[in-house]
Amino acid sequence: MVGKLITFEGPDGAGKTSALEAVVARLQKEVSQEIVVTREPGGNPISEQIRQIILDVKNTAMDDRTEALLYAAARRQHIVEKIQPALAADKLVICDRFVDSSIAYQGAGRGIGEEAVAQMNLFATDGLTPDLTLYLDVPSEVGLARIKQHRQNQYDRLDQEKLAFHQKVRQSYLKLAQAHPDRIKTIDASQPLEAVVTQCLQVIAQANLHLFEV
């Protein structure tokens, strides 16, 4: 048996991480597989160190391609060290962000090119693709307002980008969802958290992942 990989995606302020945590808490009561929860960039010591470099607000001189390459490097180490071993052990891996984030943020947001970033990550992942992606969608204005309200001036380097950047990111996500409807399922994240969580669980249950079989 081989485990399954579910990823959560969404623009900043979509409430993605809160939804993921609530979904995992429910799934742990309902599925027999061991669940491994992880995040990107990060998930292991090397990738967490790269994360600090990427998000450090002092690194204003970082080149856009450098940023994209750092994400890809962190992802590669994460896959080799954590994701692949978990999948090989028939575990359910739930990851906060994956390749779609790089395509949206660096490919579209930074303007490097979505296809260029996709190819870069094809090399980094060796073709590993999520079995299911939950895309939590929220208008950019709403997302940024939530960030301002909840993070109390504790912004990382990407949070500080202007509205136009975040709008490009969202449009790229929507395009990805349209291009990969079997894998990427869109959730309206402007709803209350409990409604978002319920919808996420429904999508997971309807996906042909065999998670709830005895």
Swiss-Prot record:
Binding locations of ATP: 10-17
GO CC term (a single one): cytosol
A Pfam family this chain is assigned to: Thymidylate_kin
UniProt GO MF annotations: ATP binding; dTMP kinase activity
Membrane spanning stretches: none
EC numbers, comma separated: 2.7.4.9
Alphabetic keyword roster: ATP-binding, Kinase, Nucleotide biosynthesis, Nucleotide-binding, Transferase
One Gene Ontology term from the biological process aspect of the record: dTTP biosynthetic process
Membrane is among the record's keywords: no
Superkingdom of origin organism: Bacteria
Catalytic activity line of the entry: dTMP + ATP = dTDP + ADP
Protein's job: Phosphorylation of dTMP to form dTDP in both de novo and salvage pathways of dTTP synthesis.
Family listed: Belongs to the thymidylate kinase family.
Annotated protein name in UniProt: Thymidylate kinase
Organism: Latilactobacillus sakei subsp. sakei (strain 23K) (Lactobacillus sakei subsp. sakei)
Gene: tmk
